Amino acid sequence: MGLSMDRSPYARTGDQQRGCWYYLRYFFLFVSLIQFLIILGLVLFMIYGNVHATTESSLRATEIRADSLYSQVVGLSASQANLSKQLNISLLVKETVMQQLLTTRREMERINASFRQCQGDLITYINYNRFIAAIILSEKQCQEQLKEVNKTCEALLFKLGEKVKTLEMEVAKEKAVCSKDKESLLAGKRQTEEQLEACGKARERQQQEQQVTEENLRKVQSLCIPLDQEKFQADVLSAWRDSLIYRTLETLPYHYQLMPEYASLRRTCESLPGIMTTKIEELARGLRAGIERVTRENAELRRQKLELERAAQAAQEARARAGTEAQARETQLRAECARQTQLALEEKAALRAQRDNLERELEARKRELEQLRTEVDVRISALDTCVKAKSLPAVPPRVSGPPPNPPPIDPASLEEFKKRILESQRLPVVNPAAQPSG
């Protein structure tokens, strides 16, 4: 079914793909046709052409031509030798010229690259001129600010010096006052110690007197307390009856008893125990009054002793409190003086540090400006060299000063420019240190 559709002349051309054999049939058909035409031409040439006459004439012409060609070959050989020599020379010259051409091309490429780099550097440094002008202006402003800061710093240093002198005078005055207070407190302390010592001695003496008085009081009390009037009177009567006088009076004869003197003497002797009792009672009352008086005096002495102890303790406490207050006042004054002095020194150090920072910044900006000027001069000279090497009528740009109306400087661009300059100046310092270590 597929073969019938392939061989049909009415078959559609886009239905199936044609194979290699389909194209080979037409190729062999055309090859056979060409072979047939060649054979037919040869047969006609052999039939209708004069082969011998044509061959002789062709042979003579060929000999003549061979002779001429031989002569030409000999001449050409000689010319070939000459040309080969010239060719060798030309090849050497060509190689030399090619080397010079390559060298010239490399030099030209290098000069072109250098020229392009110089053009880029020229554009860059033309843009840098604006930053350099801004740096110069900022340097002038920094110098003016440094002058103002120096004036302010000198004024502040003068004020601080005056303040330090005033504080030193106040400290000297306070020290004098403190020394006077200290001397007065020491004198009060010595006086208080003397009073305290005197009070201690008086207390010891009073204690000794009190002990003696108490011992005497105890003795008197031990004697007076057990005294009983009736018992004492009975003891006196019994002692009277046991006495020699009573027995003598009792043993006297009767006629002596009738005498009036005997009666008065007997009454006197009998009333003697009562009189003694009365006297002893009066003596006891006097002793009791003395004991009470001594007791009151002892109580008064104890009270005075307590008052003196309290006064001594109060004086000691006042002395300690005054010493503590004076010491605290002296410490406070010293701390205040030290704080004021430290503040003055810190302000002075801060002002000096600020002035040193401004001076270092000014020096750094001066160095940056000098480096930029040197680098710009080097780049301009390199650019002039490149321009002369290219032999182009290029006019070097004017970098002597900024344009009359420069555009405003972007602070971020200016900081970036400063950062690049610092990095470019920092790199040569790092590389020499890194080379010996490797």
Curated annotation (Swiss-Prot):
Carbohydrate attachment sites?
Answer: 82, 88, 112, 150
- A single GO BP annotation from the record? positive regulation of cellular extravasation
Kindly list the residue ranges recorded as spanning the membrane.
Answer: 27-47
Say what happens when this gene is deleted: Mutant animals result in lethality during prenatal development. Examination of the homozygous deficient embryos reveal subcutaneous edema, hemorrhages and defects in the vascular wall of subcutaneous capillaries. Hearts of deficient embryos show ventricular septal defects (VSDs) and thinner ventricular walls, as well as blood abnormalities.
Location in the cell? Cell membrane; Membrane, Caveola; Cytoplasm, Perinuclear region
Give me the stretches of Pro residues compositional bias: 394-410
UniProt keyword Acetylation present: no
Q: Name one GO cellular component term.
A: perinuclear region of cytoplasm
Protein name per UniProt: Plasmalemma vesicle-associated protein
